[in-house]
């Protein structure tokens, strides 16, 4: 078990003051995100896209988007739980015909509100005071752009949640004093949270330099033993972090493809071999369903659609 001289303080312990502050911060965050969430009652900005994405999932029709699908899959799951039937036409909705849009807005609003207590915990795990952590959380709560994006049918609230969750897990991981089993478990959780963020939007890949910096600085004392130990540990932790992250990314796309078996508006963007795996609604025969499990597989489809996103 390797002990880093950079970690001279014990693991951060949350106290009763932290619990009280977290409750107050969470209440304030949810009040601001939920306040008059039904206004305006018409389509705002990119709700025209993300509202329709939920419709396509409900109708199982394949669609195309430049971003990975995790945030949209989560929105679809909660839309299903609210019994939304996918009937709102977001393409032409100056006024929404039914109040179901409120349930769709509550999903990103909830995830956006959870960013505030997570930001508090991230700062505390860095070793800062209650005052510093509270200040950080209040800045997140009252940030106009975060509050606005989090109140509408957009993927940004969910992206911000997983990004801050990753930072929180990362900070706690490096607060662990010894590189033992506990550190390795949280190292895997770090990769999972990073993969979840990257599976919402590709901009989250920008978190990787932060991870790299912290791992490099944390392992620097190993140079005193030997350069081989330093580079070996850095390689092992770096490659495992990337592989866990990549696995989450692939699983997310696999779920996306499984949920969308029918041909839809995104079909023309696919290569020919993937087009043949989609089923027409009026021709759902057993032979066509059999084509769904033939080559190419989910792994090929994941990387293929990822490349097509950026053409």
Question: Model features per residue range: what roles?
Answer:
Residues 7-10, 209-311:
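Transmembrane-lumen/periplasm boundary regions of multi-pass, lipid-linked membrane glycan transferases
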Residues 39-52, 62-77, 85-87, 102:
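Extracytoplasmic catalytic/substrate-binding loops of multi-pass membrane glycan-assembly enzymes
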Residues 44-45, 145-159, 203:
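Short acidic/glycine- and proline-prone juxtamembrane loop motifs at membrane-interface regions
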């Amino acid at each position: 078990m390797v002990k880093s001289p950079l970690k001279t303080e014990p693991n951060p312990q949350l106290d009763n003051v932290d619990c009280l502050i977290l409750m107050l911060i969470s209440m304030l965050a949810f009040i601001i995100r939920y306040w008059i969430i039904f206004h305006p009652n018409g389509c705002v900005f990119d709700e025209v896209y993300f509202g329709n994405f939920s419709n396509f999932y409900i109708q199982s029709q394949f669609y195309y988007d430049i971003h990975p699908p995790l945030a949209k899959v989560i929105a679809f799951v909660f839309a299903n739980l609210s019994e939304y039937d996918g009937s709102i036409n977001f393409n032409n909705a100056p006024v929404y015909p039914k109040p179901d849009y409120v349930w769709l807005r509550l999903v990103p609003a909830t995830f956006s509100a959870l960013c505030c207590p997570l930001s508090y915990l991230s700062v505390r795990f860095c070793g800062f005071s209650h005052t510093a952590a509270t200040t950080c959380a209040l800045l997140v709560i009252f940030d106009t752009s975060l509050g606005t994006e989090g109140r509408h049918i957009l993927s940004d609230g969910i992206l911000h949640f997983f990004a801050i969750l990753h930072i929180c897990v990362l900070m706690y991981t490096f607060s662990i004093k010894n590189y033992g089993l506990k550190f390795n478990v949280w190292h895997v959780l770090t990769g999972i949270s990073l993969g979840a963020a990257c599976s919402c939007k590709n901009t989250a890949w920008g978190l990787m330099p932060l991870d790299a910096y912290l791992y490099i600085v944390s392992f620097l004392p190993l140079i005193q033993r030997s350069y081989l130990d330093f580079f070996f540990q850095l390689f092992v932790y770096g490659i495992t972090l990337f592989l866990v992250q990549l696995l989450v990314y692939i699983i997310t796309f696999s779920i996306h493809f499984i949920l969308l078996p029918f041909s839809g508006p995104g079909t023309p963007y696919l290569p020919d071999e993937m087009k043949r795996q989609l089923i027409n609604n009026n021709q759902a025969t057993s032979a066509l369903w059999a084509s769904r499990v033939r080559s190419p597989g989910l792994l090929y489809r994941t990387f293929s659609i990822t490349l097509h996103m950026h053409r």
